[in-house]
Amino acid sequence: EAIGFMDEHYAMAGAQLVDCPSDIFAEAEMIVKVKEPQPEECKMLRSGQVLFTYLHLAPDLHQTQALVQSNAICIAYETVTSANGRLPLLAPMSEVAGRMSIQAAAHHLEKANGGRALLLAGVPGVPAAEVVILGAGVVGSAALQMAVGMGSRVTIIDKNLDRLRELDAL
């Protein structure tokens, strides 16, 4: 209901409704999620079952070990690559992360939040904050757009000079 669909809508579309997650994991051949599996979900995975989700394995050794032990077939959205070598499922999340990074920075720069009492945009008589962004990929480019949009003075650093030229031309 919270997202605007009633159980009946799902049932009319052919979905089978169950009462608890363990029923889904016990019966489904494929689990499709957005967030990485929680520890209790990893325990419910079974050999040959397909899990398709963002996994973020690098910082989470316990999750990695649990997934390996499950013998499930785990496909990470962030590793799906298109024919041209791009990461089409990672890009939207990266865009959100880049934009949110500037919002979070603005929040933490406020004096009320323990910051240095800086406004990213500045005000008449007070210069805008200086923002340094490391990396001009999808996250960095989204952060750049947000910071420039707020009126900040931005420096973006990347080893790819062609990418920096491309951004400078915008």
Where are these regions (language model features)?
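Glycine-rich phosphate/diphosphate-binding loop of Rossmann-like nucleotide-binding domains
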Residues: 1-5, 114-170
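Short Asp/Glu-rich motifs
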Residues: 4-6, 29, 85-87, 166-167
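Conserved beta-strand edge residues that scaffold enzyme active sites
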Residues: 1, 24, 81-82, 161
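A broad detector of short, well-ordered amphipathic alpha-helices
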Residues: 26, 96-99, 103, 141, ...
